[in-house]
Amino acid sequence: MTRLRRGCVLAVVGAAFIAPAVAQELCGRPSESPEALFDRLTKTEKLKEDFRDKSYVAISDKSKETVWTFTVPGHPAHPSVVCRRPVQDGDNLRLDTNVRCNAAEAECEKLVKAFQELNHRMMQELKKQQDSKKQQTK
């Protein structure tokens, strides 16, 4: 596994691959601190929260088909942000995921792993739904 460093930006493609991001962007936006990005998305761009619990807050940018998930104070990987967006790759759909984690290396690794697992479950569920629709059309 690629070693993570404090303040690093990672690109996670699909559900299993991790590599350091080369560009200074996060899902097509200039890379900035999670706090600054949250403020820009919610205050300047007026995007609404879709979900909030004791660990995360999620915001959807429907125009860019991107979901932004921010850790909240008290989360071990705080301050961090994860952005995910679907990408059609031929007949396959995958989730491109980027992570900016400003926590300790071990906590960043846990955060990345948690989102990899979530992405994997989401893709399995999506595949089941697609297979079910194919069966219904036969």
Enumerate the predicted regions with their spans.
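N-terminal signal peptide c-region/cleavage motif recognized by signal peptidases
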Residues: 18-20
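N-terminal secretory signal peptides
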Residues: 23-78
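Mid-chain, structured segments of secreted extracytoplasmic proteins
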Residues: 67-113
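Bacterial N-terminal signal peptides that target proteins for export
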Residues: 1-11
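C-terminal partner/receptor-binding element of secreted or periplasmic proteins
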Residues: 100-138
